[in-house]
Amino acid sequence: MSTPTTFRPVLERIAEEIERTPGSGRPADYIPALAARDPRRFGMAVAELDGTVYGVGDWREPFSAQSLTKVFTLALDLAREGDALWEHVGREPSGNPFNSLVQLEYENGIPRNPFINAGALVVTDRLHTRTGDAAGELLAFLRAESGNPDLGHDEEVAASEAAHGDRNAALAHFMASYGNIDNPVPVLLDQYFRQCSVAASCADLALATGFLARHGIRADGTRLLSRSRAKQINAVMLTCGTYDAAGDFAHRVGLPGKSGVGGGIIAVVPGHCTLCVWGPGLDERGNSVAGVAALDRFTTLTGLSVF
């Protein structure tokens, strides 16, 4: 098993291997503001439990966090309402595309898990009910955990998502018809699009995810979640965090992870460290091609895995 002092050469080796591989995958094109990203960009960061960060490539370049933010809104809402959340969203893999309407009808408006779009909308809705500003609460948390007060929303991305957000609107209206949404749908969608438009770097996001490696403890030493609830989030990340490719990701990488269509993936080694990798080129399931390859190499080279 690797020790933290060997992270830097491991990252450099991974970056060299990724650089030798021709850029593959395509940036998300259904959100026009993301489509222009160069699929050959690559960054990777590892954050130790004490906040020390190692990185390679474009690890300080901000990118659109997108679905990575779902991990943090889930944690913030669980910290407030606890297990009552699970009456409104499940914890099972969906096996369907992340923006699918099909299962919602079969399951009476209860999304399969908090990481598909329908589930994330429910979590954001409930957090907004409890805080009055879910997107603002998320941003404050990310700034505090990353130590970066300059983190913010990419307004171009938020506007682009709003202009092409009919599927998310349909999901929200459908769940509202079952009584599983509290806030007016336009209010919820504005919060959700702002949430997903957060721009952050690999360093920022690796640091922000640290509470999951510290079993619920924030960067300042205060407890956000019980050890049990931190375990729950890690478990749902492992089984549901990479859209309908979660089984393949677990097979290859062996860590709890969450991907986003901005090309980012965050991953957790409980008790050791957290990672964030970014490569805008996506595979057919919406996961970063370079990101999955880099995390695969990381766990192989270091022996750090939950298995």
Swiss-Prot record:
Any matching Pfam family: Glutaminase
Organism name: Streptomyces coelicolor (strain ATCC BAA-471 / A3(2) / M145)
Family: Belongs to the glutaminase family.
Top-level taxon: Bacteria
Keywords, ordered alphabetically: Hydrolase
A GO MF label: glutaminase activity
Reaction catalyzed: L-glutamine + H2O = L-glutamate + NH4(+)
EC number: 3.5.1.2
Quaternary structure, from the entry: Homotetramer.
Keyword Ubl conjugation: no
Name under which the protein is recorded: Glutaminase
Keyword Hydrolase: yes
One BP term from GO: glutamine catabolic process
Name of the encoding gene: glsA
Disulfide bonds: none
Binding site for substrate: S67, N117, E161, N168, Y192, Y243, V261
